[in-house]
Amino acid sequence: MTTQELRPSAGVRLSVPVERYELKCGAALLVSPRPGAPVTALELHLKGGPSLDPERKEGTAYLTSALLSQGTENWSEEELAAQLEPMGAQIIGSASGLAARVEGKEWKSLAAILSEMILRPTFPADRVKLQKQRLQHRLLIERENPQAQARLGFRRLIYGDHWMGRAAYGSLESVTNINSRTLRAHHKRAWVSN
């Protein structure tokens, strides 16, 4: 085990124990054990995130992550939910990865479920359609929200046409162009390229 020192500001030192594991797929797993902690947090961060969205299909990375829990080769969405609910597990997707939380002793079960979701998602067409509708509804609401528009306008002002100048979950127009095939291709390239 190594100890990594974090220095958020001058004079403050935080020592965090970290165990590093190299996985067969080429990814690195960093573990910071907290013996006796009531909750375990698992996080997966991907290189690239929304920067890998295809042109005119911005929001692909976000939707890919959002749909990982909607069915896998071995489990339907309902079967995944039936496994997660008794554990009190929570999984949240973002354009840059996944975050999950569970009672401390259940972390191995959660890790197995996450592995299935990450390695074998199916992106069912009906679930893709539903998630796109939800995202488009969110985008319509944000279009009328001055705070959301100010944040996006500021990003565009600072970053211009760079990918950081747009919302990580795309636009009404770009989300329309995304389908199951787009998501499978992105997943293959960004999540399991090895």
Cite the ranges covered by each PLM segment.
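Short, well-ordered turn and helix-capping elements at secondary-structure junctions
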Residues: 25-27, 46-50, 179-182
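M16/MPP (pitrilysin/insulinase) zinc-metallopeptidase core fold and M16-derived inactive scaffolds
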Residues: 41-106, 144
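Acidic/histidine-enriched segments that form metal/cofactor-coordinating
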Residues: 81-193
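Short, well-ordered loop/turn elements at secondary-structure boundaries
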Residues: 24-25, 192-194
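Proteolytic maturation boundary segments
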Residues: 1-33, 39, 43
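Short connector loops/turns at beta-strand edges and beta->alpha or beta->beta junctions
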Residues: 35-37, 47, 159-163
